């Protein structure tokens, strides 16, 4: 099962303040944190989020 609700509802909610609408942000597989840091176009598959964004080391 996809841990990210994005694929089903078009909305990905990560905790209390990070929300992805219409899947415009790439969701990180493991924690479904939706927003990549500035300058990062895509999060690597299975990367782990730090806070409300992907760590830069998981960008690809």
Curated annotation (Swiss-Prot):
Q: Which residues bind a divalent metal cation 5?
A: 33, 35-36, 49
Q: Where is this region: Alpha?
A: 29-60
Residues reported in the UniProt entry to bind a divalent metal cation 7: 49, 54, 58-59
- GO MF assignments: metal ion binding
* InterPro entries named in the record: Metalthion_dom_sf, Metalthion_dom_sf_vert, Metalthion_vert, Metalthion_vert_metal_BS
Q: Is tRNA processing one of the keywords UniProt gives this record? A: no
Q: Could you tell me which cysteines form disulfide bridges?
A: none
Q: Where does a divalent metal cation 6 bind?
A: 36, 40, 43, 59
Annotated residues for binding of a divalent metal cation 1: 4, 6, 20, 23
What are the record keywords, sorted?
Metal-binding, Metal-thiolate cluster, Zinc
Q: Where does a divalent metal cation 4 bind?
A: 32-33, 43, 47
* Keyword Metal-binding in record: yes
The UniProt annotation places a divalent metal cation 2 binding at 6, 12, 14, 25
In this chain, a divalent metal cation 3 is annotated as bound at 14, 18, 23, 28
Q: Which PROSITE patterns match?
A: METALLOTHIONEIN_VRT
A Pfam family matched in the record:
Metallothio
User: Which residue ranges are recorded for the region named Beta?
Assistant: 1-28
Query: Which family does the UniProt entry place this protein in?
Result: Belongs to the metallothionein superfamily. Type 1 family.
Query: Under which name does UniProt file this protein?
Result: Metallothionein A
Function description = Metallothioneins have a high content of cysteine residues that bind various heavy metals.
What the entry says about domains is: Class I metallothioneins contain 2 metal-binding domains: four divalent ions are chelated within cluster A of the alpha domain and are coordinated via cysteinyl thiolate bridges to 11 cysteine ligands. Cluster B, the corresponding region within the beta domain, can ligate three divalent ions to 9 cysteines.
